[in-house]
């Protein structure tokens, strides 16, 4: 991490089917060992599964899920006088989306089920309904920030 200049944000190309940058971000987080075509196949199958299950637009279900998972505040460690404090900070939009996608995929991978398609679609549906492991993760983060609100004046 250079102290001299801030790294520029690279533009994210939208995916070929939904023309959505959010989908591209999710697929790039989903892929393993550089196999993006397999990641796209898994994702599109999950979206098809969501459309059949909920009879709603799957992209809207995904957007709602990511919106529900996105944290508003998080805690970061900061050393103050020999003690390490958990300082609550507001989350910027880009970081919030990145955290939401990461938590969504972690929750989907840890879920019990037959394959990643069913696990991912179930987790997205749960997150859009404000339930599921990813939502619990967000609430846990918010609780930790609330508990350490007294250290908010130590912000960076």
From Swiss-Prot:
Quick check: keyword Cytoplasm in the entry? no
Q: Which cysteines are joined by disulfide bonds?
A: none
Signal peptide positions (record): none
InterPro entries xref list:
Ribosomal_uS7 (IPR000235), Ribosomal_uS7_bac/org-type (IPR005717), Ribosomal_uS7_CS (IPR020606), Ribosomal_uS7_dom (IPR023798), Ribosomal_uS7_dom_sf (IPR036823)
Q: Which GO terms describe its molecular function?
A: rRNA binding; structural constituent of ribosome
Q: Which GO terms describe its cellular component?
A: chloroplast; small ribosomal subunit
Tell me a GO biological process for this protein.
translation
How would you summarize the oligomeric state and partners of this protein? Part of the 30S ribosomal subunit.
- Known function: One of the primary rRNA binding proteins, it binds directly to 16S rRNA where it nucleates assembly of the head domain of the 30S subunit.
Q: What is this protein called?
A: Small ribosomal subunit protein uS7c
What species was this sequence derived from?
Ostreococcus tauri
């Amino acid at each position: 991490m250079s102290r001299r200049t801030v790294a520029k944000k690279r533009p994210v190309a939208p995916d070929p089917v939904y023309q959505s940058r959010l989908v591209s971000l999710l697929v790039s987080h989903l892929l393993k060992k550089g196999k993006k075509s397999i990641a796209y196949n898994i994702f599109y199958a999950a979206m098809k599964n969501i459309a059949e299950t909920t009879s709603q637009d799957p992209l809207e279900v995904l957007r709602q899920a990511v919106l529900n998972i996105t944290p508003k505040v998080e805690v970061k460690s900061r050393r103050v006088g020999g003690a390490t404090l958990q300082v609550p900070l507001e989350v910027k939009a880009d970081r919030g989306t990145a955290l939401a996608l990461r938590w969504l995929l972690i929750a989907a991978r840890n879920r019990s089920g037959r394959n990643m398609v069913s696990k991912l679609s179930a987790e997205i549906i749960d997150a859009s309904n404000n339930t599921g492991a990813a939502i619990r993760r967000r609430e846990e983060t918010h609780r930790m920030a609330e508990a350490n609100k007294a250290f908010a004046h130590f912000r960076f």
